[in-house]
Regions:
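Poly-acidic low-complexity segments
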Residues: 2-7, 68, 72, 92, ...
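Catalytic active-site module of serine/aspartate enzymes centered on a nucleophile-bearing elbow/loop
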Residues: 125, 129-177
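Glycine-rich loops and low-complexity Gly/Arg-rich segments
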Residues: 19-24, 106-109, 139-143
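Short, solvent-exposed loop/turn and secondary-structure capping segments
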Residues: 7-11, 93-95, 127-128
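A catalytic-pocket lid/entrance helix-loop region that shapes and gates access to the active site
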Residues: 1-42
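Serine-hydrolase catalytic core
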Residues: 30, 35-124, 164, 172
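Short, low-complexity, polar/charged sequence segments that are solvent-exposed and flexible
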Residues: 14-17, 99-103, 134-137
Length: 177
């Protein structure tokens, strides 16, 4: 903990590195301690255990994403499975999936792309079997940390079942090649 918060952004540094070198990144709109306060406010406002999507939106407003900060998905070899839900309150996962799809339309690539964007599913868009393995006594508990998961439990479960069906189909096809 730092000043009562459990999470804060790095100070002018990337959160991710590759081969020991920091990767380009989108700077957060807020610094510590405002970052933690904004997350708490957003979580409370939406009745979610944790939420930060508005912080990411604000970050992109203050610092439009630059080419060097984008993931070069066109360099990925093999099958790329992109999954997101519109009701993700941690970040705009559906927007990012669409952004990657658009990027692949304009850049030559060899990867096979399977993209799935669901209306409901929350941040935890995992295959249903994986959720049952992680939480055998109540897989639905995972999505209920978010207001959308509590409001749309049936739809979230249907999303997880569909993800399982699609990922299984893709893996079986890949194994048969």
């Amino acid at each position: 903990k730092r000043d009562g918060v459990t999470e804060w952004p790095g100070e002018g540094e990337s959160s991710v590195s590759y081969h020991g070198k920091p990767l380009p990144y989108l700077p957060y709109a807020y610094r510590h301690p405002e970052y933690g306060r904004k997350m708490q406010e957003e979580s409370k406002e939406g009745k979610d255990i944790v939420a930060s999507v508005n912080m990411f939106r604000e970050s992109e407003k203050k610092h439009p994403v630059q080419e060097e900060e984008l993931i070069k998905v066109e360099n990925i070899k093999g099958t790329l499975i992109l999954v997101a839900a519109e009701d993700d309150v941690l970040w705009e996962a559906a927007k990012y999936v669409r952004r990657m799809e658009e990027r692949l339309k304009i850049h030559p690539h060899e990867c096979k792309v399977e993209a799935f964007v669901y209306k409901h599913g929350t941040h935890f868009v995992f295959p249903e079997g994986m959720v049952k393995t992680m939480l055998p006594i109540g897989g639905d508990l995972m999505t209920r940390v978010f207001a959308a998961g509590r409001k749309y439990p049936r739809e979230c479960k249907e999303t997880r079942i569909d993800i399982e069906r699609n990922v299984t189909r893709i893996i079986k096809k890949w194994m048969a090649e």
